[in-house]
């Protein structure tokens, strides 16, 4: 018994797969065909494309009921995987060559695109490679017009650029923006620190000049007048107390104190009493009498 050829088996499998459209296409076609929700989603005038008139209500009411989610962006991405194209940019109108009004049988011709993701491993550069400048050839996408790209020797910048060229554009852009923001903040903080250091140096210099210009005399005041000692007692009262003490301590002759009766204090002159016979050219009789007696004894 001869086995069927391999090509015939593959053709049979592919035809059986195409005979049944995917659930996503079937549900979408039924939603567009439903005339009760034409205010949300419907065909265009000639039936060659469908239009989502109200994306908010479509995501709120219809998507959870038929597709188990409420993300309109996910629905649009699903359409893109099946080859649907947006007709006009100002509204949500999508078309496909096999998605026509009244032509449900054509849905089996719509095949989902196979997404092939190529993961490129980023190898950390060695110590020798870090010290050298790396040269990377331009990418195949044609975005770079230069023949060669010279990259920095920094490992972080090399990793960011390599991540950007490998397809993870969103992540690398966010990292670059964050890095740029941190760099600008660092520059601003360094500028403020330099200004604060300058202000501190100016204050220190000003205080040094001020202290050096002051005289060493403590009695000097900025107004130019010397400070006077504080008087706790009146001068007159203090002088009277000194006079009374001196009178009590001085010897007395016939009840009259003899000795120095003149005292001086700061700014105060006390009136003194003259001693009997003081500053007089005439001698008193009793002095003359005792003087003669003394002369006789001495002779």
Curated annotation (Swiss-Prot):
Subunit and interaction comment: Homotrimer.
Keyword Transcription: yes
Region Hydrophobic repeat HR-A/B, annotated ranges: 166-211
Cellular compartment(s): Nucleus
Gene behind the chain: HSFB2A
Keywords: DNA-binding, Nucleus, Phosphoprotein, Stress response, Transcription, Transcription regulation
InterPro entries: HSF_DNA-bd (IPR000232), WH-like_DNA-bd_sf (IPR036388), WH_DNA-bd_sf (IPR036390)
Keyword Transit peptide found: no
Region of interest called Disordered, as start-end residue ranges on this chain: 119-157
The family this protein is said to belong to: Belongs to the HSF family. Class B subfamily.
GO CC annotation, single: nucleus
GO MF annotation: an example: transcription cis-regulatory region binding
Domains as described in the record: The hydrophobic-rich region (HR-A/B) corresponds to the oligomerization domain.
Pfam families: HSF_DNA-bind
Highest taxon above the source species: Eukaryota
Name of the molecule in the record: Heat stress transcription factor B-2a
Post-translational modification: Exhibits temperature-dependent phosphorylation.
PROSITE patterns attached to this UniProt entry: HSF_DOMAIN
Record function comment: Transcriptional regulator that specifically binds DNA sequence 5'-AGAAnnTTCT-3' known as heat shock promoter elements (HSE).
Principal subcellular localization: nucleus
Annotation: DNA-binding region: 21-115
Organism for this UniProt entry: Arabidopsis thaliana
Motif (Nuclear localization signal): 261-264
């Amino acid at each position: 018994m001869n086995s069927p050829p391999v090509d015939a088996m593959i053709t049979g499998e592919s035809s059986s797969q195409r005979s049944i459209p995917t659930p996503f296409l079937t549900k979408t076609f039924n939603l567009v065909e439903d005339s009760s929700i034409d205010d949300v989603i419907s065909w265009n005038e000639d039936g060659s494309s469908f239009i989502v008139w109200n994306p908010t209500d479509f995501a709120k009411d219809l998507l959870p009921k038929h597709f188990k989610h409420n993300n309109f962006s996910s629905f649009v991405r699903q359409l893109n995987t099946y080859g649907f194209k947006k007709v006009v940019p100002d509204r949500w109108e999508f078309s496909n060559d096999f998605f026509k009004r009244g032509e449900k049988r054509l849905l089996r011709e719509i095949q989902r695109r196979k997404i092939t993701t190529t993961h490129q491993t980023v190898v950390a550069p060695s110590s020798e490679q870090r010290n050298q400048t790396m040269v990377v050839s331009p990418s195949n996408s044609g975005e770079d017009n230069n023949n060669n790209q010279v990259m920095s020797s920094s490992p972080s910048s090399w990793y960011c650029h390599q991540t950007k060229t490998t397809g993870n554009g969103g992540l690398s852009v966010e990292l670059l923006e964050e890095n740029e923001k941190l760099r600008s903040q660092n520059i601003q903080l360094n500028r403020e620190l330099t200004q604060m250091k300058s202000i501190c140096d100016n204050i220190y210099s000003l205080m040094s000049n001020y202290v050096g210009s002051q005289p060493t005399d403590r009695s000097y005041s900025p107004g130019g007048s010397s400070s006077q000692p504080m008087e706790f007692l009146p001068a007159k009262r203090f002088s009277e107390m000194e006079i009374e003490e001196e009178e009590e301590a001085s010897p007395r002759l016939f009840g009259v104190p003899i000795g120095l009766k003149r005292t001086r204090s700061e700014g105060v002159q006390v009136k003194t009493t003259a001693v009997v016979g003081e500053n007089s050219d005439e001698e008193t009789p009793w002095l003359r009498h005792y003087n003669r007696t003394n002369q006789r004894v001495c002779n």
